[in-house]
């Protein structure tokens, strides 16, 4: 295994859909800067949104001999998400040219025996390596990994013990010890792993002390299994209700979430669909009328800008929220013009290296502030104080 990064389909690391030429350039520069595996997922599991990143990875691999495209399927529950659905997706991923598959269980919903069933079924239809990524939020992740490994999964994602468990992954050391002396023995040295854990433990303590790491995310939250809601989505929902002095409506919102999810075509609850569904559920409850106010993201989902959902969206909600609007049935990126030349022109005064344009594309305000800071450090001139129009600088 080499270094790996995760990108969100055509949104890459940002918050809007980017044209294909931006996706292509980002993948190229990621691999040339040392990333070996590009893990690509889509919040709707719409494979059309992933094809360009897979193509870009394969193109660079053909040229340079490096880079692996791993397509991640967002795991979720619902009557549409059958074994046949998952095996069909696995076959399509192999056909689209991916090098491996990741089952991305962001909410910790995949329980042990279902994991074994899923892995066995997918292994029967694809020769691609399968990697499993889950979270300990619901408390079953280690057992899920055990059954998945026994069923033939190729790779499991873990975290070093100081930052494991809770909303993170099972501890690396625990899984290494679990498989020691079995056909699945990793061969990893526990003494060396202990040194790594000792290195990171003070950072964990520092994060706890300064509030960067909330103790609440370090335990088990069984509500994840009951409501099928990822831990991060619950935290975000609580914050929204607290801001509105409406924490007493918590369970009302929890009941509304599956209704909104159904209205929007039953998408997996993963970034950004989890935030879209959660925020809309809060609005529906607090305003006393469903879809009295719809967020711009909810409208975009209903228009089809995010892609195709596994089930049809509610026509009643479509008629109420975006009455008379034309809906998109093609891949949304097909409607976008290439952007690289435009982006290069907008930030040319700051460009010092090729990667700068990608920083600007993904995080324009943050990147611009950094470019100004970098120039100030290099030239000892604070551009926020300079009067560039009159060529003056305060002394």
Say what each PLM segment does:
Residues 22, 26, 46-49, 53, ...:
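General structural feature for long, well-ordered alpha-helical segments within catalytic domains
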Residues 1-7:
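Short, small-residue-biased leader/transition segments that mark boundaries at the very start
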Residues 106-291:
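Catalytic alpha/beta core domains of metabolic enzymes, predominantly
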Residues 11-12, 16-132, 145-153:
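Alpha/beta enzyme core
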Residues 214-224, 228-395:
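Terminal or standalone catalytic/regulatory effector modules within metabolic enzymes
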């Amino acid at each position: 295994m080499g270094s790996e990064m995760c990108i969100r389909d055509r949104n890459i690391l940002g918050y809007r859909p980017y044209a294909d030429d931006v996706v292509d350039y980002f993948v190229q520069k990621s691999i040339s800067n040392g990333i070996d595996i590009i893990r690509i997922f889509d919040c709707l599991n719409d494979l059309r949104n992933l094809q360009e990143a897979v193509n870009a990875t394969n193109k660079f691999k053909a040229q340079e001999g490096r880079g692996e495209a791993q397509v991640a399927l967002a795991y979720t529950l619902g009557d549409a998400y059958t074994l046949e659905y998952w095996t069909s997706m696995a076959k399509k991923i192999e056909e689209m040219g991916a090098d491996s598959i990741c089952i991305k269980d962001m909410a910790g919903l995949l329980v042990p025996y279902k994991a074994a069933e899923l892995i066995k079924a997918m292994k029967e239809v694809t020769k691609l390596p399968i990697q499993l990524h889950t979270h300990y939020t619901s408390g079953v992740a280690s057992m899920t990994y055990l059954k998945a490994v026994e069923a033939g999964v190729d790779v499991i994602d873990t975290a070093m013990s100081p930052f494991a468990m809770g909303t993170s992954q099972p501890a690396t050391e625990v899984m290494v010890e679990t498989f020691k002396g079995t056909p699945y023995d990793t061969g990893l040295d526990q003494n060396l792993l202990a040194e790594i854990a000792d290195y990171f433990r003070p950072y964990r303590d520092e994060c706890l002390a300064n509030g960067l790491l909330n103790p609440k995310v370090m335990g088990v939250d069984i509500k994840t299994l009951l409501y099928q809601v990822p831990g991060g989505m619950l935290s975000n929902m609580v914050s929204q209700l607290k801001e509105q002095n409406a924490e007493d409506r918590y369970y009302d919102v929890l009941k509304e979430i599956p209704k909104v999810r159904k209205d929007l075509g039953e998408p997996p609850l993963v970034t950004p669909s989890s935030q879209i569904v959660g925020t809309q559920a809060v609005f529906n409850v607090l305003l006393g009328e469903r879809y009295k106010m719809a967020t711009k993201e909810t409208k975009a989902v209903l228009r089809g800008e995010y892609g195709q959902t596994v089930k049809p969206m509610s026509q009643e909600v479509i008629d109420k929220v975006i009455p008379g609007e034309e809906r998109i049935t093609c891949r949304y990126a097909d409607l976008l013009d290439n952007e690289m030349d435009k982006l290069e022109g907008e930030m040319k005064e700051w460009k010092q290296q090729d990667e700068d344009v990608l920083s600007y594309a993904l995080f324009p305000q943050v990147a611009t502030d950094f470019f100004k800071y970098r120039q100030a450090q290099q030239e000892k001139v604070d551009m926020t104080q300079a009067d560039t129009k009159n060529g003056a600088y305060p002394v």
